[in-house]
Amino acid sequence: MKVQRIEVENKPYPLYLLLDKEYQLIEPVMKFIKYLDNTGKSPNTIKAYCYHLKLLYEFMEQRGVILNDINFELLADFVGWLRYPSASNVIDLQSKKAIREETTVNTILNVVMSFLDYLSRLGEFKSIDVFKQAKGRNFKGFLHHVNKGRYQKNVLKLRVKKKQIRTLRSKEVKQIIDACHTKRDKLILMLMYEGGLRIGEVLSLRLEDIVTWDNQIHLTPRDVNVNEAYIKLRKERTIHVSKELMSLYTDYLIYEYSEELEHDYVFISLKEGYFGKPLKYQSVLDLVRRIVKRTGIEFTSHMLRHTHATQLIREGWDVAFVQKRLGHAHVQTTLNTYVHLSDQDMKNEFNKYLERKEHKK
């Protein structure tokens, strides 16, 4: 199985297809990819979907079944196989550790179910019922009084343990920024920390997106990005940043950027032989690895975004404002992800309560 990138005539961005071991196009996946593209999914999302479906077809090949053989039992086996890949139908749970976390397995399962649902709507696959009525929904929708709190739950999805999102202390952030050797690297990490930007959003920035005089950054979705960095959800938004960050941006343009480029991407490679080319996703991942090695601080790029959001909430920002700043589609995502209290948060709030109580005496 192979995921193949292709250039399509009249499309300014690449698409991805799935090929079998004979390098023949897998037609059901091709139809699904076309549907995803027509409904506005980003090239990166389509690429991820292709790789997830590649796993399904590898599983089917190993089991000696075809798509129309897929039933509830095989889907359940597929979920187990994702965690414990095995050449046989027997899984030795005693000697193996799951290679994928529950959240990853659930993400892959969601893609597979969307794929099968699409084929079912075309009349090319028999629908599989994997849902049951459940209670206990966190968020009450507009029609909650009609549904009486019941919703559809996928019984194949794995239970995910609620994890405390790890954030960085201010001292650690300073060490990380100080460990950068270039203004470009400092600016990239500061945009994630102070602006809450994702890697794709940072790398998609063009010179016209940054308004230095008003300390604003416009995040603008574009169909064509040669470095394949895209804004998630394809929604525009504007964030405000500090004068200090804008000053760092200006210094980067003066001392490290080139005026002789044929493009206007903000972040470029500074390596000899590659100088001036738009920076790619892997380069930022490599940067983070270097900083981890230099500082001994274990962190990810997304942890900088987590830290920013958590600090905003601790400072009293309304969750709706945090949602808009981070670019979440739903406020519930912000609530579920960032409204978490550490033991220290609880202690601080209790001490404030005691102070107010003492003041009233």
From Swiss-Prot:
CDD domains: INT_tnpA_C_Tn554. GO terms for molecular function: DNA binding. This is Transposase A from transposon Tn554. Residues 163-351 form the Tyr recombinase domain. Pfam families: Phage_int_SAM_1, Phage_integrase. SUPFAM superfamilies: DNA breaking-rejoining enzymes. The lineage of its organism: Bacteria, Bacillati, Bacillota, Bacilli, Bacillales. Belongs to the 'phage' integrase family. It comes from the Bacteria. One of three proteins encoded by transposon Tn554 required for its transposition. GO terms for biological process: DNA integration; DNA recombination. InterPro entries: CB (IPR044068), DNA_brk_join_enz (IPR011010), INT_tnpA_C_Tn554 (IPR042721), Integrase-like_cat_sf (IPR013762), Integrase_catalytic (IPR002104), Integrase_recombinase_N (IPR010998), Integrase_SAM-like_N (IPR004107), Tyrosine_recombinase_XerCD (IPR050090). Residues 23-120 form the Core-binding (CB) domain. The active site is at residues 198, 232, 302, 305, 328, 338. PANTHER family: INTEGRASE_RECOMBINASE PROTEIN MJ0367-RELATED, PHAGE INTEGRASE-RELATED. Keywords: DNA integration, DNA recombination, DNA-binding, Transposable element.
